[in-house]
Amino acid sequence: CCAIRLCNVYLCGSCCP
């Protein structure tokens, strides 16, 4: 999803705008 691995599929929306 995002380049940050800490960002899960669920957190992808808030991690990557």
UniProtKB/Swiss-Prot annotation:
Chief localisation class: secreted
Disulfide links within the chain: C1-C16, C2-C12, C7-C15
Superkingdom of origin: Eukaryota
Single annotated GO MF: toxin activity
Tissues/organs with expression: Expressed by the venom duct.
Residues modified to 4-hydroxyproline: P17
UniProt entry keywords in alphabetical sequence: Disulfide bond, Hydroxylation, Secreted, Toxin
GO cellular component labels: extracellular region
Cellular compartment(s): Secreted
Comment on protein domains: The cysteine framework is III (CC-C-C-CC).
Family assignment from sequence similarity: Belongs to the conotoxin M superfamily.
Protein name: Conotoxin reg3i
Organism: Conus regius (Crown cone)
Lineage: Eukaryota, Metazoa, Spiralia, Lophotrochozoa, Mollusca
